[in-house]
């Protein structure tokens, strides 16, 4: 399988994990020991990262129905490493009623090809995408 295609397949799995509220499906896209530098949350490293991410997602999915749209600007391959960047648009609809919110973040993901041939995220970084202000 082409490497760019394989990363796109993994990103589809990531998106569908959010869209079905399946924390395990989302976490499956990450390497067993990855670094999570998500905006607004403490950084997580190594073996601690998957468990903390899973717990965060389980809480999120318990409180909200989620719909994720991924906008990939580029996927860049470099041997057994790759990175991709773009935007995530996450729609949060409260399960107990209330106003739906849209959160748009910029992201950068570093990927590594595993011995199995699958691509997994080894570092995740995101931050809020703020509108440009004209001076």
Residue ranges of model-derived segments:
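A solvent-exposed, acidic/Ser-Thr-rich amphipathic alpha-helical stretch
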Residues: 2-12, 23-78, 87, 99-102
